[in-house]
Amino acid sequence: MVAVDYFTKWAEADALANIRDVDIKKFVWRNIVTRFGVAKSLVSNIGLQFDSNTFQKFCFDLGIKNKYSTPVYLQSNGQAEATNKAIVNGLRKRLEGTKGMWAEELPNVLWAYWTTPRRSMGETPFSLTYGGEVVIPTEVSLCSERVSRFVL
């Protein structure tokens, strides 16, 4: 499951064993609402899990408008398609033919996605989401100026 914020290009993704309405509801609650607040709208494919009474009520109760992309024209949800492609390509590069480990590599691929500037904006999704650049592990080990200013 992948969710993308259209403005910041921030992506949340999780390896779900099932994609039932209750699983999607749990994903939206854990990965979006509790971290970033209630979304104004949600654009999804017209899968049954997004169109179920359970998920519709969940969205209605939170004031989220549930919208659908056109099933025959996937480009109508182009941001999600581009993000899916970036995540799949990142997983392919990290796994190099090894199958079955993609769920363990997903957080690493997301980290790379969040901290890489997007061409369309010239900024990272991380900086647009949190208002500053991420401190990367190399900065800590080399004690960069940004890190040394905050050493207690």
For the regions a language model picked out, list residue spans one by one:
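Integrase module of LTR retroelements
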Residues: M1-L152
